[in-house]
Amino acid sequence: MIAELWSRAILKRIRARNEASSRLATEVPDQEGRNINRVLLREARFEDFPEISAMNSRLGQGPDSLENWHRLWRDNPAIRSFNAPSRIGWLLEDSGRIVGFLGSIPLQYEFRGAPLVAAATCRFAVEPQYRAFSHLLVMAFFRQKEIQLFIDSSATPAAGKIMAAAKAQVLPQKTYESILFWVLNPRRYSAYALRKMGLTGTAVWLGRVLGQLVLQAASLFWNRRPPASTASLEVRNEPLSSLGDRFEQFVDTISHRQTQLLARRSSEILLWHFEAPQNRRPVSLFTCYRNGQMSGYLVLRFYEESQEGLKRSVVADLLVQDDDSTIVAALLRAALDQAQKAGADILEVVGFPMKIRECLFRWRPFSRSLPANPFYFKAREKKLHEALQQEVAWYACPYDGDSTLWP
C-alpha cells in the first residue's frame, strides 16, 4: 500500500512537469528550508562517457570503455535492423557534475510469434547523497514510448524497491533466485566456505583439506557429472564467429514452436552480445548435433575475476530442441569439462524454466539463494503485462537483459 501511494505521488509529480523539456530541475531543501542543490535530469550523450564511467567506478561498477558504448548504442542489432531507439539513458547533474546514471539498452524479443522492442536497464548508480532522486531516472526509463517491454535483470534489493514502486513486477519464474552449482575445485571451495563462516589462518588451511575429502565423498550422491555423450549425439566446441545457416535454421525452428517470451537469437546477435571490446570474460560455445542436425547449444562464460576468492563459469545461454534431457546432459557435461579446464572453481546455472532445471536436478547440483529475485519487468500494454505475469510465459536466463552484456 505504501509503495503504491509513493508510486502515485512520484507519477503525479513528474507528469506535472513539462515532458517536452529535456531537462528537469529539482531543488533539495536543507533542514532550515534553504535550497542547497539543484539537480537536473537529462539524456546522456557519448561525450558524457568519461565522467559517467569515473562515477560508476567510484560506486563499484565494473570497467567500461567508449568502444563498448559504441557497441551498445551504435552497433546494436536492435538499433540497426529493428528500428529501436538509440537512447543511451539518463543522468542526474548537480551544478554541472554528474551524480547519477541509468542506461537503457534496446533489445529484440519475441512472444507468441510477434516481435517486441524491449529495453534493459544498465549501470544504475547514484551517489549516496543524491539517492532521493533515483526514482527520476527510473521514471524516465519507463516513459520511453517506443518500448513495449522494460526489463531490469540485475536489480539490487534497493533498486528492486524503486522498480516495484514504479509498478514493475518481479519475474514470476519462481526459482530464478535459486542458483544451482557444481563444485569443480573442492579444496578452494572449502576454503571459501570456511572464510564465509568467519574462520581464518590455520583453521582454514586444515579445514579445506577435510572439506575436500567430504566433497569428494559427497560426489557419490551430489555434484555429479553426466556420462559422456551417447553415440547418437555429437557435441562440438565452436567459435561464435563460425555460426551460420545451421544455427539460423535451429533458432528459427525453436522460435516458431515457442510460446514463451524469448530474447532474439541469431549468429549476428550472439556475436554482438558476447564479444564485447576489451572482454575479460571469454565464452565457449558448445553445439549439439543429432543425425547431423543442430539440436541445441550452450554458451559458457568464464569470470576470470574472483568473487570472494572463487573463480566462476556461468551458463550464460542454453537452448535445446523440445527441452530434450539427453541433449541438456550432453551439453552440461561439455560445460563442466571446459569450466574445469579453464580453472573455474564452480559452475553456476541461473534461471531457465523448470523443464530445463529438472533435467539438471538429475545430476544433483548444490544450490544457494540470492537475497532477492533481481529480475523485474513491465510491459507498456496491459494485455502483454497480464500475459507475462504467468510463469509459463518466461524463458528467463542470464542471456536476458544486461546480465551477460558487460565485458
Regions found by a protein language model. Name each.
Residues 49, 63, 131-132, 325-329:
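Loop/helix-junction capping segments adjacent to catalytic residues or to phosphate/diphosphate-binding pockets
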Residues 39-124, 233-320:
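A conserved beta-strand-loop-helix scaffold within acyl/acetyltransferase catalytic domains
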Residues 2, 6, 11-18, 33, ...:
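Active-site/acyl-donor-binding loops of N-acyltransferases
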Residues 2-6, 10-47, 214-245:
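Conserved N-terminal entry element of GNAT/NAT acetyltransferase domains
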Residues 100, 106-110, 115-180:
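Internal, well-ordered domain-core segments that constitute the primary functional module
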Residues 95-96, 144-145, 341:
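Secondary-structure boundary elements
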